[in-house]
């Protein structure tokens, strides 16, 4: 594998690794404070909605479509052309997200005033009301991260997710214990921390964008051929990712029918799976997308083939043993990480 790619993957992997490590600390604290309670399960279900938009309009489908076109524009038209494209896409994305948040609040008010909803739905909606604007921030963060990655600036985008975990952990330690005696009151502090972290993540990106010469401005010229290309390329990716993410949402909702504990238990297990995935596959994919886009813009398909082959061998070398280890050692790993004696995550939670 190209040394520059490997070095960049290590930078992204290091930032992702730190984020995943802090994310694991965050989940340990969540298990310590909330266990597999209804409050924790309601939070996990409510947090799915901003994450769904992040996957579709942020680091998922939009980034997969935007980064290649943005990289090509950089190669051919320089920063001026890239700024114009980023301004048009950013304006379109911000408009969609703002309208989505408004519609979301209208739907929540309609549901609560029209239907008789139970304790679980009430708990989910109370948290979603707080966290819904997070999708606006995090999708714009993902767009700015895509621009920086296209300029081969990987450090700040890789470290930006760390801020979410830092704010989240800080809230668990210093804010949530003082919000009341019930878990429902304490979990509201986590929801507010998530929203605050989204704003912080966006603000951190701005100075780096300006330093790199990226100064996109609002533009409603969405008839641009490159904007249309981004949207056309986004369609298949959004369809594929959308189906997967909707399945994730359905999984968590169906888990509620198993028991109040089930969505929380499912989320704790997913955190362990995503740890090696984020360290290797996600980090490498983040670096490879702008690299492949640059090769394609320069009409160098042989470099794409060589790099892809090396990347696949590297991923398999790491992920196959990690997968086997998680399967064979599932119970002792969960028990070691999450089971803190005397708190809400007990032996039954481990089995769940």
Give names to the regions the model predicted.
Residues 1-352:
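Membrane-embedded alpha-helical bundles of multi-pass transporters/translocases
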């Amino acid at each position: 594998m190209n040394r520059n790619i490997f070095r960049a993957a290590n930078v992204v992997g290091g930032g992702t690794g730190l984020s995943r490590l802090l994310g694991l600390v965050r989940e340990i604290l969540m298990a310590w404070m909330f266990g597999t309670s209804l409050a924790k399960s309601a939070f996990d279900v409510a947090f799915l909605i901003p994450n769904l938009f992040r996957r579709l309009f942020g680091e998922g489908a939009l980034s997969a479509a935007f980064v290649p076109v943005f990289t090509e524009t950089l190669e051919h038209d320089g920063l001026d052309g890239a700024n114009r494209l980023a301004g048009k896409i950013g304006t379109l994305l911000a408009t969609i997200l703002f309208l989505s948040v408004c519609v979301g609040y209208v739907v929540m008010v309609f549901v609560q005033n029209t239907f008789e909803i139970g304790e679980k739905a009430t708990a989910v909606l109370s948290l979603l009301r707080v966290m819904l604007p997070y999708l606006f921030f995090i999708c714009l963060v993902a767009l700015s991260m895509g621009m920086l990655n296209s300029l081969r600036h990987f450090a700040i985008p890789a470290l930006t997710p760390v801020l979410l975990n830092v704010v989240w952990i800080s809230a668990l330690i210093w804010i949530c214990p003082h919000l009341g005696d019930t878990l429902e009151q304490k979990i509201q502090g986590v929801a507010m921390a998530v929203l605050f972290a989204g704003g912080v993540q966006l603000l951190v990106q701005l100075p780096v964008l300006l330093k790199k010469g990226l100064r996109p401005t609002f533009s409603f010229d969405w008839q641009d051929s490159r904007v249309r290309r981004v949207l056309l390329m986004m369609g298949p990716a959004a369809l594929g990712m959308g189906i997967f993410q909707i399945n994730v949402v359905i999984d968590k909702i169906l888990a509620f029918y198993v028991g109040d504990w089930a969505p929380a238990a499912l989320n704790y297990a997913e955190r362990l799976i995503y740890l090696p995935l984020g360290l290797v596959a996600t980090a490498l994919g983040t670096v490879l997308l702008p690299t492949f886009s640059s090769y394609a813009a320069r009409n160098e398909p042989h470099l794409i083939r060589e790099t892809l082959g090396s990347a696949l061998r590297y991923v398999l070398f790491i992920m196959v043993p990690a997968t086997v280890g998680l399967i064979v050692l599932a119970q002792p790993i969960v028990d070691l990480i999450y089971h803190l004696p005397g708190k809400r995550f007990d032996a039954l939670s481990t089995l769940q």
